[in-house]
Amino acid sequence: EGLAMLRAVLDDFRAWGGVRTTTTRDYRLTNASLSADKVVELSPQDHDEVLEKLAGQCTAALIIAPESDGILASLSALMVRNGARLLGSGPGSVATAADKWACHRLFTQAGLPTPDTCYADADGACKAAEKIGFPLVIKPVDGVSCEGISLIPDVPSLHSVLEKSRYVDRRFLLQRYIEGEHASACLLVAGNDNLCLSINRQFIEIDRPFSYQGSEVPFTGDKHQAAITLAQRAAALVPGLKGYIGVDLLIANEGCYGIEINPRLTTSYIGLRSVVNLNLAQAIWEASIQNILPRNVVLQGKFAFRKENLI
């Protein structure tokens, strides 16, 4: 997914022509073609040193990285510390959005619909589960895609999942399971304003663990406008968000629920760029650097993809 997003955004920057691009590439991906003006290989031994040098040489940086384990926030801070402007959210807002419990509290404090959720550890899991009720979903406090998320139908299943290393000696979320359509929103944020570009269907396999399989862009239905409104309200809750972000949603019979905020480029970018009437890389630059949002955005057609076919 990361490589597919990188290729897509580099192609869009080249099509725009407004900047020259330098990208890093994992040393294990030497055969991966990239449409950057310059490609710099990264290895674990020189990772930070190379990034610090590049940050000092560039005007701005767009980071494609997971927010789990503080990776995205740390890389964002590294870039800012070495003089680069971010084509995206600052490290503080990334850290807030990456914390699913912090997001849940922001949603509830703002009166946004979101599934009942408890913050728990292994010792308090059964008591928290009684409060939520089965079936429920267990998820790490931070994570990307469907990483570490499982559907728990009963107490024995909860005990089984808690024995896994991911949840040993760590806190996690237990969340009420709601039947519905898994969806996401793609947004641009500029200053205090934001614009929802699309609502997307997510193809999720509900299993132990959940598995993200792909997306369809755009996704429309009778709750389309409600989903847009919810996504825009959610995006406004975290100060400092900027550029492209995603908001995960659940569209149920009774309404829409906010799940979490993704303060970064999301995989749906790949589908969105194929149906939108603007250059998304240029739009990200203008939102992040100039605080300008595009006007007269139109989506034409649909684009569906499966994760295994991205590269």
Positions of the model-derived regions?
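A short glycine-rich, hydrophobically flanked beta-strand micro-motif that places a catalytic Asp/Glu
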Residues: 241-253
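A structural signal for isolated positions on well-ordered beta-strands in alpha/beta enzyme cores
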Residues: 20-22, 195
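Active-site nucleotide/adenylate-binding loops and adjacent lid/helix of ATP-dependent enzymes
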Residues: 94-181, 189-194, 216-229
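ATP-dependent carboxylate/phosphate-activation module, predominantly the ATP-grasp catalytic core
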Residues: 176-239, 251, 262-288, 299, ...
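Conserved protein kinase catalytic/activation segment
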Residues: 255-257
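Short glycine-rich anion-binding loops that position phosphate/pyrophosphate groups of nucleotides
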Residues: 66-69, 142-143, 264
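Short catalytic helix/loop segments, enriched in acidic residues and glycine
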Residues: 1-13
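Conserved N-proximal alpha/beta basic substrate-recognition cap immediately N-terminal to
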Residues: 12-13, 23-122, 127
